[in-house]
Amino acid sequence: MKNVDLVIDLQFGSTGKGLIAGYLAEKNGYDTVINANMPNAGHTYINAEGRKWMHKVLPNGIVSPNLKRVMLGAGSVFSINRLMEEIEMSKDLLHDKVAILIHPMATVLDEEAHKKAEVGIATSIGSTGQGSMAAMVEKLQRDPTNNTIVARDVAQYDGRIAQYVCTVEEWDMALMASERILAEGAQGFSLSLNQEFYPYCTSRDCTPARFLADMGIPLPMLNKVIGTARCHPIRVGGTSGGHYPDQEELTWEQLGQVPELTTVTKKVRRVFSFSFIQMQKAMWTCQPDEVFLNFCNYLSPMGWQDIVHQIEVAAQSRYCDAEVKYLGFGPTFNDVELREDVM
């Protein structure tokens, strides 16, 4: 059954994945929402009434009116404290009829130890330094005496997550029982470990194939990929690496905009001109069906319409049939427009 819609970032992150995930969840009424987040990324959604969610653990799709399951994949790295905070903040949505399932092989973050292990790279490569990489490395070491790294083991002595951690069989059965699934990717394609910006990158690939694997979703279940992009791509502040040869680094003053801050570290973001080359590479690897172009409010109608055209030309040049379907003009549900309504 092809019933999984996957949201994925086509640039360097911070393109509005949280916004479009919340928007689609409210519009389409998915019964299951799933992700494999790490603490190095935050996802924000503001609904039509102005209520705000900033998640580092839970999917933003929990706002779906038909919600039955919230699932955290094996590729997740999460803080138990943060998970509890997010559940408490949305307890009106996560009622008794909603099941929260944590994959037994999800990684549990030791906030103090794992963050401390990343102090050096936080400055040398512009990492957020939240401990994601250190936690993953500890899991990869596969120490049979370590009972503090995967959710299955931690649940044996930490009752806060014991009720949520399932077996692999229960995980698979939950996916099979789902009617419509919204899967939420994190970070951005160009931050992928195996793309060209290594070592100024994240600790995994940010592609559809990787996220489906991290969520335990079989490939035949994929219905469509919704790619997200912004008119002016950003990178985190500091020594966060280079950019594509057809783009230049800009200033927020040049754009006439208040400087944006990163969701997690609150650093001023670096901002760039749009890259056709970046979009070609993302289209080839990610093969989105639909695109959400965000931050159109930073440009005139002629400006963002030109970028819409560039995105679709880039797609066609890489054997991809993607169309720009959604446009973002601000941070809330009310600021998302269907392209057909404004062009």
From Swiss-Prot:
GO terms for biological process: 'de novo' AMP biosynthetic process; IMP metabolic process; purine nucleotide biosynthetic process. DGMP binds at S14, N40, S127, T128, R142, T202. L-aspartate binds at T263, V264, R269. Pathway: Purine metabolism. ATP binds at S14, T15, G16, K17, G18, G42, H43, T44, Q187, N294, N297, G330. Keywords: ATP-binding, Ligase, Magnesium, Metal-binding, Nucleotide-binding, Purine biosynthesis. InterPro entries: Adenylosuccinate_synth_dom1, Adenylosuccinate_synthetase, P-loop_NTPase, Phage_PurZ. Involved in the synthesis of the atypical nucleotide dZTP (2-amino-2'-deoxyadenosine-5'-triphosphate). Catalyzes the condensation of aspartate with deoxyguanylate into dSMP (N6-succino-2-amino-2'-deoxyadenylate), which undergoes defumarylation and phosphorylation respectively by host PurB and guanylate/nucleoside diphosphate kinases to give dZTP. dZTP is integrated into the viral genome instead of adenine by the viral DNA polymerase. This Z-base probably completely replaces adenosine and forms a triple bond to the opposite T-base. The resulting non-standard viral DNA is called Z-genome. This is N6-succino-2-amino-2'-deoxyadenylate synthase. It comes from Vibrio phage phiVC8. The gene is purZ.
